[in-house]
Amino acid sequence: MNSLIATPPVPPHFYETSCRSPSYSMSSTNTSVNRKRKAEDDCPPSGDTRMSASPSGSPALHPRPLAPRHLKRPRPNVSGRPLSLPRLMETLDTDALRSVLRSLCDRHPEIASEVMHTAPRPSVSAALEVLSNYQSTLQSSFPLGGNPSSDYAYNRVRQHLTNLLEALNDFTPHFLPPNESQPSTSLSYLDGATDIIHRLPRWTTPQHNIEEYAATEAGTKNWQSTNETAGGKLQDALKRAQPEPWVDRWQTWATRATALRETSRRYANSSCRAHTVLAYRSKSGHGNSIQYQSSKPHFLFSTFNPSIHPSITALLSTPHYTVQVDGFRAIFNETITIPIC
């Protein structure tokens, strides 16, 4: 008996409406496509699929064109070059700059004249500092031990001594009238130059002291010319303002300065000691006090003992004046020279 066996019913698939993978076909049409199909190609996108997929054409995210970057590429062939003039000047010290400027002035005289007119006038402190440097070099060149006044010491320091005296002879005319119109500037320089002359070394051999004698005599001449100029200007100024009785004493300035020069010449020839007394008016109007500064006996402006020099005692009896021994340090002073042989 032919009976049909009832097949149990197949329950429907849970995702009935979901897409099923297409059956794989080996037809020639499918092989010509040669690509794997995806589920998204046949199935309508669900809500979950739409949320997980990234938007392809969002209107809020338009691609912005980037500006081209101009990169400075290193040059393949970099060659060296010398420094510019300002940078080169920054690397030079004072001595190197002085050497370069001196060589330029020697090769080009027109540059030398331009430098002379452009450079500022040297001050008294700058000139005395240069002279002090020469003197320090002289003192440091003495040999250690032994007699500092011997011929051996003289030969060791002779060149440095010559450099100091040459610098002194070059600087001094610059601060003298008529090149220097201010008497106070001239006297201030001469005061410092006199101290340098006083510190010159003294030698055992008399021939070696000729340079010191010449510098001393030149210093007295410079004091004479400067004192005459300063005295005349001061006298004219006081007569125009409020003349005083002691102004007339300035008329004897030139004579006493000449006596100082003669004394220095005798000092150089016969080893006389010259004592210079500077008299000026006391601020209180009277007084007979003595002020002095210690120095070596062989110096031109040396200290004195008034108890053994009666000629100085007579000067002390003059009222309204004070006696000072200080190597022409005061500007408004009168000079009296007392040679002691």
UniProtKB/Swiss-Prot annotation:
Q: What is the designated name of this protein? A: Tethering factor for nuclear proteasome STS1
Comp. bias (Low complexity): 21-32
Cross-referenced Pfam families = Cut8
Q: What lineage does UniProt assign to this protein's organism?
A: Eukaryota, Fungi, Dikarya, Ascomycota, Pezizomycotina
Q: Tell me the keywords, alphabetical order.
A: Cytoplasm, Nucleus, Protein transport, Transport
Q: State whether keyword Protein transport applies.
A: yes
The record describes the protein's role as: Involved in ubiquitin-mediated protein degradation. Regulatory factor in the ubiquitin/proteasome pathway that controls the turnover of proteasome substrates. Targets proteasomes to the nucleus and facilitates the degradation of nuclear proteins.
Organism whose genome encodes this protein:
Arthroderma otae (strain ATCC MYA-4605 / CBS 113480)
Q: Where in the cell is it found?
A: Cytoplasm; Nucleus
Q: Which GO terms describe its cellular component?
A: cytoplasm; nuclear membrane
Q: What is its main location?
A: cytoplasm
Q: Which Gene3D superfamilies match?
A: Tethering factor for nuclear proteasome Cut8/Sts1
Q: Which family does it belong to?
A: Belongs to the cut8/STS1 family.
> How does this protein assemble?
Binds the proteasome.
Q: Does the keyword Nucleus apply?
A: yes
Outline the segment boundaries, as ranges, of region: Disordered: 1-84
